[in-house]
Amino acid sequence: WFTRDMSSKILNISFAFFEFIILYLILRPPLFFQQNILIILAFLVSIVIAIMIYFYMLFIVSSVPFWAPELGWGSHFLVTIILIEFLSGALFPIDILPAGIGQVVMSLPFPYLIYFPVQVYLGNITGALLVKGLLISSIWLVILGISMKYVWSKGLKVYEGVGR
């Protein structure tokens, strides 16, 4: 499933690349290319962790139909569109949230999907904050990985295949 998910993402990125080129040629915005190799390496590590967190979260949500088959598409839509897009920093930077809410959101796995890797790439998160962010995202990676295996094993026990 992971390779299927990755191939879908690569296809989406290829289409987005052409859209990006067209918009760039029309608007000519300034582009920022990170020069610091350590920041680039930290960014790549944060991207790999983000990909795995995203996969684990969607795998867990996609397992909901084991217990409630009628919720297959709805639960997936709710999590991907509402929760992930909203809380990951894809729609707006998490910095604009009030301090208390921002701290709560930063303790969840969602910001480590988009907001954190982007801030690392821009060089806004370095040093101790970078290590803290990578540690928190790694902890979420382990928690979600264990949860995924648990949900999958429990789901297979209750699975009932019916049909012709």
Each language-model region and where it sits:
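Membrane-interface junctions
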Residues: S8, N12, E70, L97, ...
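Alpha-helical transmembrane segments and their short interhelical loops
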Residues: K9-S75, L130-I139, I143-I146
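Helix-loop-helix units of permease transmembrane domains in multi-pass membrane transporters
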Residues: W1-K9
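Short alpha-helical linear motifs
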Residues: L25-P30, G100-V104, G127-L129, L156-Y159
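Junction motif at the cytosolic side of a transmembrane helix
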Residues: Y121-N124, K132-R164
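Transmembrane alpha-helical segments that form the membrane-embedded catalytic/substrate-channel core
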Residues: V48-S63, L83-D95, I146-G155
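Transmembrane helix segments
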Residues: P30, V61-V120
